[in-house]
Amino acid sequence: MPMLAELVEVVIGVDTHKDTHTAAVVTASTGAVVEQATVPTDAGGYQALLDLAAAHPGLRAFALEGSGGYGAGLARHLADAGEVVVELDRPARPARWAGAKSDPIDAVRAARDALARTRLAAPKTGPARAALAAYMSARRSAIEAAATTERQLHALVITAPEPVRARFRGQTTRAMVTTASRLRPHTAAGDVEAHAVLDVLRDMARRVIFLREQADAHEKAIKALVASWRPDLLKLAGVGPIVAATVLTAWSHPGRVHSEAAFAMLAGAAPIPASSGKTVRYRLNRSGDRQLNRALHTIALTRLQRDERTRAYADRRRAQGKTDREIKRCLKRYIARELYRLLESPLSEASTALNAA
């Protein structure tokens, strides 16, 4: 696999921040810095970086740190302009000479680090992927906030005055939420503590209900997006809208992940060789995208319960002496391969255009 230095003539390394981006133009042949600039994080600043790159003719690539965070806007702008953009999620950091640290230095390091690599990731792009990521983040936040509030409500019930606590005795947490949402604090106006507890319990319960409704609304939007972008995913055994959305946001678009082995590594489903001498063994992969790994785990568990072919496979592997945990790891690797091949296969023009628009 050739290094980036063999494919381009200049690399523009960019150190991204909230208000400014600092860029350094570095030649591929010598690694020399030929120009640097700091621009604001707006359309004018993005265009200034394009003009900076255009002043140095020849094949070029942009190397961005934080293309999924502060550099997201710039990455979109560059992609729309047809520029080659590579993502540096965890750039190698050499020892700083005399403690040197600045945005221009980091931009130069980003460019030189990109030049030395043989494997470079492309930023996640596409409006459909971005929309899914937004809905998924909001849904996850709503679910977590609802769970936190439920725990707080349960704890408050336990320490509440006996007349209040008696209303919830024998109820599950979910039933407590329903009961608390219907409380009428003014009925305990003569008791300051009871009135306050009833008031807070009702507010907490209504907050939980609101957050649940939000999460449900986001899930419906996610399902509609997945169905319009990649309906073929939903036809796979064990793949629902949330699992499909998790897979799509990690994969992003065709060609971003260069092979099914790389996709398995991204998902943390590829075993790590740990052999020595005559001993051949593999170590569990605990890296990668853990949300994607969880999605594969969900698919594997669902298929083990409901899919006859998967259950037959598990029985065969048990007969060979494999443990249930080892069988699940094997299944996740096979599922990663199946998903990758499906995602990289051609789609209808309408579905492809949805994320390319």
Write out the residue ranges for each language-model feature.
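Gly/Thr-rich phosphate-binding beta-strand-loop-beta motif of the actin/hexokinase/Hsp70
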Residues: 2-27, 110, 142
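Short glycine-rich, Thr/Ser-proximal phosphate-binding strand/loop in the N-terminal lobe
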Residues: 18-44
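Short, basic/hydrophobic alpha-helical segments
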Residues: 44-61
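Short glycine-rich phosphate-binding loop at a beta-alpha junction
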Residues: 58-70
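Short alpha-helix plus adjacent loop in nuclease-associated cores
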Residues: 79, 85-123, 130, 134, ...
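Phosphate-backbone recognition surface of nucleic-acid-processing proteins
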Residues: 102, 235, 241-320, 324
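Glycine-rich, often acidic, oxyanion-interacting loops/wings at catalytic, nucleic-acid
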Residues: 135-232, 356
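Low-complexity, acidic/Ser/Thr- and charged residue-rich accessory regions of DNA metabolism proteins
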Residues: 277-278, 282, 314-357
